[in-house]
């Protein structure tokens, strides 16, 4: 279910870099690296007060699987240049997709369709359906404004992006003074956060606005 007219989201307007260790690109360049060191270096990106809120177990998991994920992306036709330096990483790990981030959308959309995935655009989820404490589907409004439901055999994945353009959520968790800053993606409304909370989920670290967690258009004032 895609709420916009076409897939893409913030990824579609991003730079498209993918940071990973132990990749084939590093090996070709003669770079000796490890997923363990990658996880250690990642802990130095955020200020200490934010790093204290981080989850080292999740970080190590993602670091450990980053090279395999890059291989998987390339198996679907995506191409990368690099790696290039990205301090405070101690080794060059930034792989940049070519020609740009829209390649992610085009290639993965094609791969999904080949697997029989049906992508409904202008279909906005409005509610998670639950049964005995388990999420079993979603309710959504289609492009005609009609309310429909879809049930799942396995689960529901919330891939809805951040909340940089939801003034209410920002005011609620960050406090006043930030809610009027324009987000770079007008469709980043935190829909997934809202749906999850309505279904009983607990929202964590919603006050963190450092770095890529929330992306804002630069202000003219300094």
Q: For each predicted feature, which ranges?
A:
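Conserved N-terminal/central alpha/beta ligand/cofactor-binding core
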Residues: 6-7, 12-118
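Residue-level marker for beta-strand->alpha-helix junctions and adjacent short loops that shape enzyme
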Residues: 6, 25, 126, 145, ...
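Glycine-rich loop(s) and the adjacent beta-strand/alpha-helix scaffold that form part
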Residues: 144-147, 151-220
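Gly/Ser/Thr-rich helix-start
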Residues: 9-13, 17, 138, 162-163, ...
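Helical element adjacent to the flavin cofactor pocket in flavoenzyme catalytic cores
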Residues: 96-154, 190-199
């Amino acid at each position: 279910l895609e709420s916009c007219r076409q897939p893409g989201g913030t990824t579609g307007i991003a730079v498209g870099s993918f940071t990973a260790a132990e990749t084939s690109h590093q090996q070709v360049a003669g770079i000796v690296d490890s997923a363990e060191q990658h996880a250690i270096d990642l802990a130095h990106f955020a200020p200490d007060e934010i790093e204290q809120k981080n989850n080292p177990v999740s970080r190590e998991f993602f670091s450990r699987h980053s090279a395999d994920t890059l291989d998987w992306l390339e198996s679907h036709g995506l191409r990368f240049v690099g790696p290039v330096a990205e301090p405070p990483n101690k080794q060059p790990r930034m792989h940049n997709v070519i020609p740009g981030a829209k390649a992610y959308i085009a290639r993965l959309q094609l791969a999904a369709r080949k697997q029989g995935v049906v992508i409904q655009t202008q279909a906005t989820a409005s509610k998670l359906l639950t049964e005995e404490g388990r999420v079993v589907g979603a309710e959504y409004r289609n492009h005609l404004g009609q309310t429909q439901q879809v049930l799942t055999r396995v689960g529901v994945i919330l891939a809805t992006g951040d909340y940089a353009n939801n003034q209410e959520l920002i005011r609620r968790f960050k406090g006043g003074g930030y809610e009027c800053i324009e987000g770079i993606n007008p469709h980043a409304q935190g829909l997934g956060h809202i749906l999850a909370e309505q279904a009983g989920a607990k929202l964590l670290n919603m006050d963190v606005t450092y770095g890529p967690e929330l992306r804002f258009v630069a202000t003219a004032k300094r």
